[in-house]
Curated annotation (Swiss-Prot):
The lineage of its organism: Eukaryota, Viridiplantae, Streptophyta, Embryophyta, Tracheophyta. GO terms for biological process: translation. Keywords: Metal-binding, Ribonucleoprotein, Ribosomal protein, Zinc, Zinc-finger. A zinc finger (C4-type) spans 39-61. Disulfide bonds: none annotated. The keyword Zinc-finger applies. InterPro entries: Ribosomal_eS27 (IPR000592), Ribosomal_eS27_Zn-bd_dom_sf (IPR023407), Ribosomal_zn-bd (IPR011332). GO terms for molecular function: structural constituent of ribosome; zinc ion binding. It comes from Hordeum vulgare (Barley). This is Small ribosomal subunit protein eS27.
């Protein structure tokens, strides 16, 4: 007897794995990452940690790029970012 709600536990869908806690995934992986942030004023690119606990300023024009919150850092309005690859 096969039920429609059967889920393959060895090969779960990626969407369901992303919703789980980082320690309860099939393969543990962190939620944090490094990112390249482009300054809106001088277009300098700075590498920033996603869960930064300090204010990050642009080395070129001293503009604040991101501010810490309780979890992920909040980017300043107008700054663009891209996730760094492995």
């Amino acid at each position: 007897m096969v039920l429609q709600n059967d889920i393959d536990l060895l090969n779960p869908p990626a969407e369901l794995e992303k919703l789980k806690h980082k320690k309860k995934r099939l393969v543990q992986s962190p939620n944090s990452f490094f990112m390249d942030v482009k300054c809106q004023g001088c277009f300098n690119i700075t590498t920033v940690f996603s869960h930064s606990q300090t204010v990050v300023v642009c080395p070129g024009c001293q503009t604040v790029l991101c501010q810490p919150t309780g979890g992920k850092a909040r980017l300043t309005e107008g700054c663009s970012f891209r996730r760094k690859g492995d």
